[in-house]
Amino acid sequence: MSKRRAVLGLKNERKRSGGMVFADLTDEDAFRMAYEVILRREPDAVGTADLLPRLKAGQLTRDQIVEFLISSEEFRGLRRASLLGPSLHMSRCDFIRSLPRARRVLDLGGTHQSNDDGALLGLGYPYKVDEVVIVDLPPDDRHPIYRAGGRLTEKRTAMGMVRYRYHSMTDLSGFEDESFDLVYSGQSIEHIGEDDADLVFDGVYRVLRPGGYLGLDTPNARVTRLQQAEFIDPDHKIEYTVAELSAKIERSGLRVKELKGLNYAGECLSDGKFSEGTVASSPGIYHEAADCYLIAYLCEKPHQGRSVQPSTSVIG
């Protein structure tokens, strides 16, 4: 959605109860409609407590509220998602379908905004499981753009039982040693700090059975740093290069078995300039991980026990 379309949407949007246009609505209804049309969600508590009183007091106009929302990082993310999002989604589905068969799976940060089966099954994991355990923050503790979904305790699906645990993925102490065949972390490690990431990888090592796998995909900082002012997600704490994340993973004792990239971005790196269209037009899984928009790992817990491996020799 462009800025122009967002504004036109507000001008043309009619309130379902009464057919009133935006200019005729009460301040409360106009405020809510601005969020629904521009950000595609209800107003959050912060906006309601800060912006709405100023609108009602005449300190802000409706046009200023609209401009504030259109200028937000969240709106820019929605605009990018309209083109790049579906392409990345396709590539991530390909990656998930390539993960090994497992009976018991731990999915870190795995709630799905619109599918209670969770991210792993929702994106096409092809094997039936005994159980998928999804660990994610309680909905009210997540960033506002991630509060949809993940409100169940369990769900029986055609692929197996899905159970939810609502707490930080940095604390896996509630799970027994060597109790999972596969751990999946899809677009979640970038939402926590570096020290917390070390806790996650140590926890993953402990709960994986010997020979078990960690599948992980995350933005590649070598590419996303070209974006700068239009940073992909307001909730990201840190994005890693291949070299940085490989070293962190291997310090936990896990071994990088396969390293791939999703959505080739080599042309952007050569030009030194990010192009959403270029990246969106190159979906798929690539061997040149350091030159892709997302990096995707398959890591293994060695049968012989913890042994720190030297970092993978890669660019980035």
Language-model segments: what does each one mean?
Residues 258-316:
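A C-terminal cap/extension of S-adenosyl-L-methionine-dependent methyltransferases
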Residues 198-213:
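A short glycine-rich, Lys/Arg-flanked "PGG" loop and its adjoining helix->strand segment in the class I
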Residues 170-183:
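A short acidic, Gly/Pro-enriched loop at the edge of an enzyme's catalytic core
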Residues 6-79:
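Substrate/cofactor-recognition hotspot
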Residues 76-100:
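Class I SAM-dependent methyltransferase Rossmann-like catalytic core
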Residues 237-253, 259:
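Short alpha-helix
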Residues 216-236:
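Short, glycine-/aromatic-enriched active-site segment of Class I SAM-dependent methyltransferases
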Residues 110-172:
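Class I SAM-dependent methyltransferase SAM/SAH-binding core
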